[in-house]
């Protein structure tokens, strides 16, 4: 297994519920290290740019509105098979379909307000990390 980096967002719904620490603990207990982290309020332009691949989809406006509705925590996670491990921890996109004990099953309300985002590939992880973090902001541990 290779050590990878992946990108994570703790979304506005989870930040509002004050479960940042609980979610972060899940990452760490699964062997993922947080090598960069910051809380920020996304601007409309930042959210539109980040989710540009969905710009033609019907839900795009609602997605941008949700992601700018409150602060988020953006993080870089590092560890063995980090991308797959993070996706397993998150659970299915729709929390009603997420396995018990996953982040979305435990902390998300709906497919729209689903607590977390995680990269789905190495290419996506590299792009998403670079979108929010300068190389000098990502540490090694």
Swiss-Prot record:
It is found in: Cytoplasm. Its cofactor is Mg(2+). It catalyses: a 2'-deoxyribonucleoside 5'-diphosphate + ATP = a 2'-deoxyribonucleoside 5'-triphosphate + ADP; a ribonucleoside 5'-diphosphate + ATP = a ribonucleoside 5'-triphosphate + ADP. The keyword NAD does not apply. The keyword Magnesium applies. This is Nucleoside diphosphate kinase. One of its GO terms (molecular function) is metal ion binding. It comes from Pseudomonas putida (strain ATCC 47054 / DSM 6125 / CFBP 8728 / NCIMB 11950 / KT2440).
């Amino acid at each position: 297994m290779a050590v990878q980096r992946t990108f994570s967002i703790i979304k506005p719904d989870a930040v509002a519920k004050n479960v940042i620490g609980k979610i972060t603990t899940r990452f760490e207990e699964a062997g993922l290290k947080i090598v960069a982290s910051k809380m920020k309020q996304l601007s409309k332009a930042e959210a539109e740019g980040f989710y540009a691949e969905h710009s033609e989809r019907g839900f795009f406006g609602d997605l941008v509105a949700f992601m700018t509705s409150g602060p988020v925590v953006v993080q870089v996670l590092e560890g063995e098979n980090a991308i797959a491990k993070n996706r397993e921890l998150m659970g299915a996109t729709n929390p009603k379909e997420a396995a018990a004990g996953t982040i979305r099953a435990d902390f998300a309300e709906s497919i729209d307000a689903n607590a977390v985002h995680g990269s789905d590939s190495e290419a996506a992880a590299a792009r998403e990390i670079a979108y929010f973090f300068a190389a000098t902001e990502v540490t090694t541990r």
